[in-house]
Amino acid sequence: KYIFPFIDFCLTANNNYFGFDLHSLTSLKKLNYNIYDEGTEYNWHIDAVPRDPVRDIKLTALLNLSEETYEGGDLVLFRANEIICSEFNTPGSAIIFPSYINHKVNKITSGKRLTLAIWMSGPKFR
């Protein structure tokens, strides 16, 4: 029930805020279903890999698919400082950000966190 509104969200967010030249979402090659159980976390990383001739990821979009509440598991973005995105813990919520932004998922302290990740690609940045 969330996937089509999520795709609309991705397209609208890119058009209104980022303006990146993207390949059609119908050519998506990578969706990732993430399951974070109690005690798991994902350390700091970026999704875009500089100077990679194959990957041209520009935007990362995440959709929270959890149907039950969980504790911990905050998404944290790092630009000039850490930004904790606790609003993303609400089921059905979505977030989109440039794939070159460093981010992590804090440790789940109870419950299970389920998300869908879409990486949107386009021609290389100039």
Segments from the language model and where they lie:
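Fe(II)/2-oxoglutarate oxygenase catalytic core
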Residues: K1-A94, Y100-R126
